[in-house]
């Protein structure tokens, strides 16, 4: 078995799905379907009965949700420094532990509003200039966001 320690994880072991090879620099490890492995680990973390450690919380955020500390903070209604502190000290508040699990599970299981909210936060972080374009259709106003350079005037 291979002890998988990516992202500071200490309790993950791979029974298979990896190859150890010798390189000029020592042993190297390659993983089959790394995205699937990451998803599987994150789902296991959302289902575990004990509280998340700081490393587990960080793994769900960074490898699973692919968001920064400030982005997760925005989703949770707090500042990014709080997220950083929890990850460093392993003192994740119970409410944040549960919310991170729910956000990840909803995003990966295709909960459209959650997935869109996470994607919006990630997009905002990339500082894309956008315009809000509002169209009236059948008496209802419908907003949409468009990249500034794609909007026709």
Question: What residue ranges belong to the model's regions?
Answer:
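N-terminal flexible/basic segments that precede or flank functional cores
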Residues: 1-51, 109-134, 138-141
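Short, leucine-enriched amphipathic alpha-helices that occur as contiguous helical runs
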Residues: 53-57, 97
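Short basic helix-loop element that most often maps to the first helix and adjoining turn
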Residues: 56-71
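Short alpha-helical "recognition helix" segments of helix-turn-helix
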Residues: 68-76, 83
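Short, basic-rich loop-to-helix N-cap that marks the start of a DNA-contacting helix
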Residues: 89-102
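Extended, acidic-biased charged interface segments
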Residues: 100-110
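C-terminal, charged low-complexity interaction regions
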Residues: 140-153
């Amino acid at each position: 078995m291979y002890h998988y320690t990516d992202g500071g994880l200490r309790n993950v072991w791979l029974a298979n799905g990896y190859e150890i090879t010798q390189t000029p620099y020592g042993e190297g490890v390659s993983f089959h379907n790394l995205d699937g492995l990451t998803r599987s680990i994150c789902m296991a973390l959302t289902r575990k009965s004990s509280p998340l450690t700081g490393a587990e919380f960080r793994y769900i955020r960074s490898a699973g949700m692919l968001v920064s500390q400030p982005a997760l903070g925005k989703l949770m209604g707090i500042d990014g420094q709080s997220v950083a502190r929890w990850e460093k000290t392993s003192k994740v508040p119970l409410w944040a532990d549960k919310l991170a699990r729910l956000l990840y599970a909803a995003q990966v299981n295709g909960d459209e509003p959650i997935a869109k909210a996470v994607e919006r936060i990630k997009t905002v972080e990339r500082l894309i200039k956008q315009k809000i374009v509002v169209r009236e259709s059948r008496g209802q106003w419908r907003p949409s966001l468009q990249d500034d350079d794609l909007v026709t005037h």
